[in-house]
């Protein structure tokens, strides 16, 4: 991926411009993920009227699968698709998953769950899990591919990249949790 003739360096930091694209992409992906997680139990118990134990089981299963699927997504990227295609497909699947989660909440009428709400929630979770599997292991790899082997700037690049992850993870629960909990 590294190209010696690539002149797309930021004049301010000495890092490739692609690093900042990856920084913001990952920051917003983490914001989306942790923001959804911040209100997911509330959504299942308040809007879909699930029992707390059932909602906790769904939440735990979702979280576990989100951390398991990158093993398969990384393998598919390494063997067949490559990083870019895997990130693109994963991002699109996660966007579709978030959209379906939004729609599942939009079909709840006066606190009464409908079969379509629950079905859309499950479809949304499925797309989020699969999309994350393709997205997560490959975007970090692309940070390393921006630099030639042995480049001293790579440590700083990963620090910048992980700062994006942490910013998204920090602000998402505060913002989405504050907006999502209406006190009902």
Locate each region found by the language model.
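Interfacial helix-cap and linker-helix signal at transmembrane-aqueous boundaries
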Residues: 44-45, 76-80, 175-183
């Amino acid at each position: 991926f590294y190209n010696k003739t690539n002149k797309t360096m930021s004049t301010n930091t000495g890092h490739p411009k692609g690093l900042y694209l990856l920084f913001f992409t990952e920051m917003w992906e983490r914001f989306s993920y942790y923001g959804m997680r911040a209100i997911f139990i509330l959504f299942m118990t308040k809007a879909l009227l699930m029992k707390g134990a059932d909602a906790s089981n769904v939440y735990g299963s979702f979280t576990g699968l989100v951390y398991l699927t990158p093993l398969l997504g990384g393998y598919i990227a390494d063997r067949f698709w490559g990083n870019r295609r895997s990130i693109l497909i994963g991002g699109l699947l996660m966007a579709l998953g978030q959209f379906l989660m939004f729609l599942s909440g939009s079909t709840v009428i006066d606190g009464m769950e409908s079969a379509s709400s629950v079905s859309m929630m499950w479809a949304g979770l499925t797309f989020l899990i699969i999309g994350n599997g393709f997205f997560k292991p490959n975007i970090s790899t692309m940070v390393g591919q921006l630099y030639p082997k042995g480049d001293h700037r790579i440590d700083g690049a990963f620090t910048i990249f992980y700062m994006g992850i942490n910013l998204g993870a920090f602000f998402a629960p505060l913002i989405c949790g504050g907006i999502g909990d209406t006190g009902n």
